[in-house]
Swiss-Prot record:
Heme b b566 binds at H97, H196. The gene is MT-CYB. The cytochrome bc1 complex contains 11 subunits: 3 respiratory subunits (MT-CYB, CYC1 and UQCRFS1), 2 core proteins (UQCRC1 and UQCRC2) and 6 low-molecular weight proteins (UQCRH/QCR6, UQCRB/QCR7, UQCRQ/QCR8, UQCR10/QCR9, UQCR11/QCR10 and a cleavage product of UQCRFS1). This cytochrome bc1 complex then forms a dimer. The lineage of its organism: Eukaryota, Metazoa, Chordata, Craniata, Vertebrata. This is Cytochrome b. One of its GO terms (biological process) is mitochondrial electron transport, ubiquinol to cytochrome c. Its main location: mitochondrion. It comes from Mirza coquereli. SUPFAM superfamilies: a domain/subunit of cytochrome bc1 complex (Ubiquinol-cytochrome c reductase) (SSF81648), Transmembrane di-heme cytochromes (SSF81342). The keyword Phosphoprotein does not apply. Belongs to the cytochrome b family. Heme b b562 binds at H83, H182. It is found in: Mitochondrion inner membrane. One of its GO terms (cellular component) is mitochondrial inner membrane.
Length: 379
């Protein structure tokens, strides 16, 4: 009798995706982050659902409903902090996942890569709207500043901003629709994740060498299920240490002050995971130029396959490309730091240099270095 997991229509899909899936025998721990992102998404949806049971999307009661969750709801404080810090874990895994794709040349799997970019934008939109919901000072002013960027679009900008706001300023209508979108988007993300996996399983995973793995595959279970489980334990350990020891480490103290349209905080800034893009936005004096640079800082990932000049897919045997990759990583850390600093002369200059370096590395320096390495292979 054939095993039920190979015969049952539903079990068959699960089996071919997570049990009998042929996987490369040499994929390293950098390949763990896909499953960790799935775990983060599950954690966020579950904790978010419980928070939504007690939250009220109304300007008069939103702030106090979050306070009520933390003070009066059974284990409400831990659910709230797991959700807030879970977002940070989500983005940490996302950035490593994208970095892994760049380093090992996974962007050559174009459908998977492009769905991944759409996922990145969707997750960023979801996180932004979630940050607005507690209706603290930084929530309100962050929403005002970021949505106002759309007014830079010629002709329709102002109308578009007022349409998104549902009025002439960020108010009750804005909060209500942001809550509605914040609730529905994670389910859209889940659907996109399924499409992402569908395309990945069409071609099979890349591996650290960047070579084809067809001749050497192993079953996903038990080898990679155990490996993913270990990664998940590390993730949960890190998340719970953050939640239980310093839950406000990555947050902003201004968000513990209820939103007040009459008082502007001294320094408006988004959460840490948006700071690199925020620094690029601020480094360009022109509003429209800044918005375009902001969008391009993420959208530039889509043209990576066109910029590939190397004969080797992975960077494992390309030391100069490795140096450029880690320079790019350091540059992103610099941009993140600058995004959190006030707009003062020294910080502005550093931000502008880091922004120019970011685009130069991806568009010019890395493809050029790859060409040089190609020529060195002939020696």
């Amino acid at each position: 009798m054939t095993n039920i997991r190979k015969m049952h229509p539903l079990m068959k899909i699960m089996n071919s995706s997570f049990i009998d899936l042929p996987a490369p025998s040499n994929i390293s721990s950098w390949w763990n982050f896909g499953s960790l992102l799935g775990a983060c998404l599950a954690i966020q949806i579950i904790t978010g659902l419980f928070l939504a049971m007690h939250y009220t999307a109304d300007t008069a009661t939103a702030f106090s409903s979050v306070t009520h969750i933390c003070r009066d709801v059974n284990q409400g404080w831990i659910i709230r902090y797991i959700h807030a810090n879970g977002a940070s874990m989500f983005f940490m895994c996302l950035f490593i996942h994208v970095g892994r794709g760049m380093y090992y040349g996974s962007f050559t799997l174009s459908e998977t890569w492009n769905i991944g970019i759409i996922l990145l934008f969707t997750v960023m939109a979801t996180a932004f709207m979630g940050y607005v919901l507690p209706w603290g000072q930084m929530s309100f002013w962050g929403a005002t500043v970021i949505t106002n960027l759309l007014s830079a679009i010629p002709y329709i900008g102002t109308s578009l901003v007022e349409w998104i706001w549902g009025g002439f300023s960020v108010d009750k209508a804005t909060l209500t629709r942001f809550f509605a979108f914040h609730f529905i988007l994670p389910f859209i993300i889940t659907a996109l994740v399924m499409v992402h996996l569908l395309f990945l399983h069409e071609t099979g995973s890349n591996n650290p060498l960047g070579t084809t793995s067809d001749s050497d595959k192993i079953p996903f279970h038990p080898y990679y299920t155990i490996k993913d489980l270990l990664g998940l334990l590390f993730l949960l350990l890190l998340l719970m240490m953050l939640v239980l020891f310093s839950p406000d480490l990555l947050g902003d103290p201004d968000n513990y002050t209820p939103a007040n349209p009459l008082i502007t905080p001294p320094h408006i800034k988004p959460e840490w995971y948006f700071l690199f893009a925020y620094a690029i936005l601020r480094s360009i004096p022109n509003k429209l130029g800044g918005v375009l640079a902001l969008i391009m800082s993420i959208l530039i990932l889509a043209i990576l396959p066109l910029l590939q000049t190397t004969k080797q897919r992975s960077m494992v045997f390309r030391p100069f490309s490795q140096i450029m990759f880690w320079t790019l990583t350091a540059d992103l850390f610099t941009l993140t730091w600058i995004g959190g600093q006030p707009v003062e002369y020294a910080f502005v200059i550093i931000g502008q240099i880091a922004s120019i370096l970011y685009f130069s590395l991806i568009l010019i320096i890395m493809p050029t270095v790859s060409l040089i390495e190609n020529n060195m292979l002939k020696w």
